[in-house]
């Protein structure tokens, strides 16, 4: 089962649909409807932290999931979930130099990252965000996997754990190859039946 932590965002059900085309076992729970222990007791094969409004610290159990389940359950954070990943592991989340809502930008990929297997070096990615993880604040255990031409971080991976973050939205129609990214994540962590 894939567990999606819903951070009260309309994109959550786009994620649900994208995952549901790959595996029938998907469950969505609100970020304040259960504890991390209760989430772990569901025995998910992977957890996806959804986009959402506000700051990562205000997103229910989202940051606690990263802190308490690292190394136990593979995790993919999208937008707010990505920012939570950056913050939990020592990065700084700050106001983006340019607010971007509903724009598809070119995103350069590190194709050694399992999420970007069989993708071209640059893809279009949908951006809807006011905050970013500041590159200068990254600890050594967080590796940049995707960025804009201006150098804004669009993807992260943890050096030691199966934890990945995407600032852009793979579930959006404005990310034409987004379904491949989601499938690559689920396949890489062994979560496809």
Model-found features: residue ranges?
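Short hydrophobic/Thr-rich beta-strand motif most characteristic of the beta2 strand and flanking loop
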Residues: 25-31
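Two-component/phosphorelay signaling modules centered on CheY-like receiver
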Residues: 16-25
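Short amphipathic alpha-helix with an adjacent loop that forms part of the alpha/beta core around
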Residues: 35-43, 137
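Acyltransferase
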Residues: 173-193
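Catalytic beta-strand/loop cores that center a nucleophilic Ser/Cys/Thr
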Residues: 113-160
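Proline-aspartate-enriched helix->loop->beta-strand connector
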Residues: 43-44, 170
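Cysteine-nucleophile active-site neighborhood
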Residues: 44-113, 117, 182-184
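Extreme N-terminal starter segment of soluble prokaryotic enzymes
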Residues: 1-3
């Amino acid at each position: 089962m894939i567990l999606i932590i819903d951070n009260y965002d309309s994109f959550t059900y786009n994620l649900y649909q994208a995952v549901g085309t790959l595996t029938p076992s998907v469950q969505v729970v609100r970020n304040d409807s259960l504890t991390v222990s209760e989430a772990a007791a569901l025995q998910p094969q992977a957890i996806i932290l959804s986009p959402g409004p506000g700051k990562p610290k205000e997103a229910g159990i989202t940051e606690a999931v990263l802190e308490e389940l690292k190394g136990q359950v593979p995790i993919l954070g999208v937008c707010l979930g990505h920012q939570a990943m950056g913050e939990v592991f020592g990065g700084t989340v700050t106001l983006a130099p340019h607010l971007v809502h509903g724009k598809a930008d070119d995103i350069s990929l590190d194709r050694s990252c399992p999420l970007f297997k069989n993708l071209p070096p640059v893809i279009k990615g949908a951006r809807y965000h006011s905050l970013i993880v500041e590159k200068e604040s990254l600890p050594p255990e967080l590796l940049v996997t995707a960025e804009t031409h201006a150098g804004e971080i669009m993807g992260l991976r943890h050096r030691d754990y199966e934890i990945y973050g995407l600032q852009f939205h793979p579930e959006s129609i404005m990310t034409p190859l987004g379904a491949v990214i989601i499938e690559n994540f689920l396949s890489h962590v062994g979560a496809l039946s």
